[in-house]
UniProtKB/Swiss-Prot annotation:
Main location: plastid
Protein name: Protein PsbN
Location relative to the cell: Plastid, Chloroplast thylakoid membrane
HAMAP family registered for this protein in UniProt: PSII_PsbN (MF_00293)
Transmembrane segments: 6-26
Origin superkingdom: Eukaryota
Position of the signal peptide: none
Pfam family for this entry, one: PsbN
Length: 44
């Protein structure tokens, strides 16, 4: 448990988990109302 690789792995796992959680929050949570949809803006 004193290995630096163990703590580095835990750090990377937490970083990846937090980035994923934030992306889901921005994509589907309350901030998603401010996102624009380029397909809706494009007129054929």
């Amino acid at each position: 448990m004193d290995s630096p690789a163990f703590f580095f792995t835990i750090f990377l796992w937490c970083l990846l988990l937090s980035i994923t959680g934030y992306s889901i929050y921005v994509g589907f949570g309350p901030p998603s109302q401010q996102l624009r949809d380029p397909f809706e803006e494009h007129e054929d």
